[in-house]
Amino acid sequence: MNPLRQLLKSAGSHAPLGTWIMAASPLVTEAMGHAGFQWCVIDMEHTPLDMMEVIHLLQAAGNTKMVPIVRVPWNDTVSIKRVLDAGAQTLLIPFVQNADEAQRAVAATRYPPEGIRGLAGMSRGSKFGTVPDYARTANKTVGAVLQLETPAAVAQLEAIAAVPGVDSLFLGPGDLSAALGHAGNTGHPDVMRVMADAARRCNAVGMPVGTVGGTPEVVVQYRAMGFNYVAIGSDLGLLMRGAQAAVKALTTPDGETHVHTLSGGTQTSSGAY
């Protein structure tokens, strides 16, 4: 079974928590898994990650229980084929607008006769040719998650969900906010209404649906709407928030570092211990 499908099945009514991976650091990815995140999205759309970096991040996630999903740069056959050959088992395919584009996305993830994925005998995806009957079994273990990011796409939700081979839908609140005229304001009532409506409709047709929120409070809201799995921020976002909080807590309004007493002496940012 596909790892994401298995995770969602075992989670029941509890929405698994994930995060976004944007840093090209296997150590950070592995740390996120050990921190307790149950799934992650390795993002090739909005980062400069190359294929070898993606492989290293997949290997790092593989050292944990965290299920990796790779977001490809675009809904095109070549990108999808290369990422699958690199060993990804679940793909997030961005900006799917209708059933035709959904069919094209799914076809790119499947070998003939179910799809058009090109066959390579020696790839990381097939464990370098050691997986028995990989060309036949891969179609059952690959997962396709399609991202809806505009009101036009959400209007086609049921038609997209009905395409055979679609494992899950994923709402992109950032691009959705821009498409609704509220760029960057994902908490705007117009955006939240569309998000809630999309979650309700996915639940009605039995289609798992995920999304991403920037704060714990937003994640709780999305879970209450009916989203089956939700990510919070990203590795870089979590790093920046922690770093900024530390700097704010230890810096005076005039920009000087607070003075601390250490072993009977004082220490400032300009001195040495």
Regions found by a protein language model. Give the residues of each.
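Conserved anion-binding
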Residues: 78, 88-164, 175-178, 254, ...
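Conserved beta-strand positions in the central sheet of alpha/beta enzyme cores
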Residues: 40-41, 69, 92, 170, ...
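Extended, intrinsically disordered, low-complexity segments
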Residues: 2, 234-238, 242-273
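Glycine-rich beta-to-alpha transition loops that act as phosphate-gripper elements at the mouths
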Residues: 20-24, 70-77, 94-96, 147-152, ...
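N-terminal amphipathic alpha-helix/helix-capping segment at the start of soluble metabolic enzymes
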Residues: 1-22, 128-140, 196-198, 203-204, ...
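Conserved N-terminal beta1-alpha1 strand-loop-helix module at the mouth
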Residues: 1-75, 107, 144, 162-167
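Active-site-adjacent beta->alpha loops and helix N-cap segments on the catalytic face
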Residues: 1-6, 46-66, 74-81, 96-134, ...
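Short, electropositive alpha-helical surface patch
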Residues: 219-236
